[in-house]
Regions:
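Hydrophobic alpha-helical transmembrane segments in multi-pass integral membrane proteins
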Residues: 29-32, 88-103
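Small-residue-rich segments of transmembrane alpha-helices in multi-pass membrane proteins
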Residues: 79-91
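Membrane-interface helix termini and inter-helical loops of multi-pass transporters
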Residues: 37-42, 98-108
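Hydrophobic residues within the alpha-helical transmembrane core of Major Facilitator Superfamily
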Residues: 27-31, 58, 126
Length: 138
């Protein structure tokens, strides 16, 4: 994060939210260890890693977008939405055409990772659009 693009409030909010996301990650790692030791594998390693990364990331991105701390002074919402939609398409389309089933024997397979990542990018674009609507209503 380059500090010259963010004001003091945005920097403080980003630090606070990143601390929260880190705490969520710690709790999820402990919960993952308990689930794996009690019930066995619930997902293959790549899908498990993606889930453990995406949940705190979704928290951080959503809260920072709606707190107006995600983008710097020079960033454009439309440009961000465009690029996140492009990334979503680049991850989601191949996951349906090139890879196998994302769920097998009641567990996530490694082929779910690109699909989950694409959904994450789609979520970021939707959060940006929702924040624009929220600003227009205010």
């Amino acid at each position: 994060m380059r500090h010259e693009h963010y004001d003091e409030r945005q920097t403080f909010v980003n630090y606070k939210l990143s601390h929260h996301a880190l705490m969520i990650l710690f709790v999820m790692l402990v919960a993952n260890a308990l689930v794996k030791s009690t019930f066995g594998l619930w997902a293959e390693p790549m899908a498990e890693t993606i889930i453990l990364i995406l949940v705190p990331s979704i928290y951080y991105v959503t809260r920072s977008i709606f707190a107006d701390a995600y983008m710097g002074r020079r960033d454009s919402v439309r440009k961000n939405v465009f690029w996140f939609l492009i990334l979503a398409v680049l991850f989601i389309v191949p996951s349906f055409t090139l890879y196998g089933d994302p769920i097998f024997d009641s567990g996530l397979t490694d082929t779910a990772a690109p699909l989950l990542t694409g959904i994450f990018f789609l979520f970021i674009a939707a959060a940006h659009i929702a924040s624009l609507w929220k600003k227009d209503d205010a």
